[in-house]
Amino acid sequence: VPDYISAKIMRQLKNGNVYTCMGCRSFLTVEEKQKNPDGSYKFYGRFNQGVVTINLVDVACSSEGDFDKFWEILEDRLELCHRALRCRHERLLGTVSDVAPILWQYGALARLKKGETIDKLLYDGYSTISLGYAGIYEMCMRMYGKSHTDPEVRPFAMKVMQRLNDKCAEWRAAENISYSVYGTPMESTTYRFSKCLQKRFGIIPGVTDKNYIT
């Protein structure tokens, strides 16, 4: 079943803009500093610096269902993700355009000079870097025994998502790097995460009893 994009909703969320995603689901942010010569927002040619995913199921299982512990562990894991994202960003700093002329010199992503670094493209919203998340459903099953779609549980799930978004905004304000929240597609990671969860916590019905997480 393909993913469908609502142009109507996207216009509401993206300042009236409708545009395609990068790959399967990563959408660039609308940036006031990144506009085309005609004044329209720039999307084509921008890029993402990478993703680090937080395993929310692990956070819930590590807390053993204690909400105070959950929020403490979540904060620790978010800081760990931040450090990992910084590693990705810093690995790109100093890269010269010559390593991929089609990307950096001939217009696929930019038109830099030979020998010029890509550093300026890593700031001011030209590129994004993503905090991915996985396991909202299983996280809620561990904490409440119910799905995130349950009216009782939905506020908790939304509070977690808001915290992820707030942390990205905090990091961005401090560093001028466009951190964003991203629903990680998972692909092979879903199996790896599930096996790690089973090894650490055993089989918990509705939480770790599958070879994938949502």
Indicate where each model-derived feature is located:
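Conserved catalytic cores of very large enzyme subunits
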Residues: 1-125, 142, 146-214
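Contiguous, well-ordered alpha-helical segments that form the cores/surfaces of helical PPI scaffolds
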Residues: 129-142, 162
